[in-house]
Amino acid sequence: ATKTTVTGTGENATGVAVTTRIYKTYEKEWGISCRELFTQFMVRIHEQINGCIIGQFSKLKIPVAPNFASFRRLFRARAGHCFIVPGNTFDNVKGQFPVGFFTWHTDDKRPVGEIVADVFNKNGEFIGTKKLEVEQNVMSINDWIISTRNRIGEKIIGFMSAKGCDFQNQNYNFIINEKSQLPHPRGTLVTDMNLKEIAVYLAVRHSVKKTWLNDRDQFTEPFDTWSHDIEFQNDCLAYTLFSISNNIQSAFGINYWQPFTEADLGITNELPNHFMTDYISGKGRPKAIQ
């Protein structure tokens, strides 16, 4: 999905690479990465031309993209010298993302592991190195937040859009009243039972500035120490309550996110609900997550 498909203002192109013979031959084994034409070239060379050196440039899908997990599991070659440059150094490219130049030595068969690439800026100046690697046996941050769904007795207080696990999808991570506000919602319900995790998720994904170099970096599940760090949890909740990515509006339903009491606001009329102030004080917080 793209910005236009998430918001309902456009459609993605279909059938670009899924009608080829190579796709039909290898898709079942190599997975959805074969929907990319450049992947089909890589797979065919890997399967049919032994001992060659492959030169490849693309976005950083092979070393880090979640959809390329099956590709990384099957592809066997030693990564040679690699370097990364900003994508907008190419003609007619405006996006802020990295493009990698890779060499693969297929005569030295080994799994795709850690790759250390040189990094050059738009002026061709060397600015350092970057490690490209997907941690094995670690859940993505999206799989982690999905695991907080469907807790017994939960009260729904909103919906969090959560497309992708990387910085390029940062703008698609926000909180709204109802998932019906989106034509193609991707995310999870926010409840009184998972608000703590939702706050951590949103704060972590938005508190680090997106750059062209980290654009494809993947967020993974947090270390368990977060669950015992009350100060960190409170900071994340405060960030989430006042973040511009919190788009709760009374026009679309009940606002459970009001963090102030009548006394705080200096008003005499009773507010529609006191969910958030009760939650913050601990009075309305489910015992299972206190």
Residue ranges with predicted function:
Residues 2-3, 60-63, 107-109:
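Short, solvent-exposed loop/turn segments at secondary-structure junctions
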Residues 21-28, 32, 91, 96, ...:
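Class I S-adenosyl-L-methionine
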Residues 4-8, 64-71, 94-97:
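A short acidic (Asp/Glu
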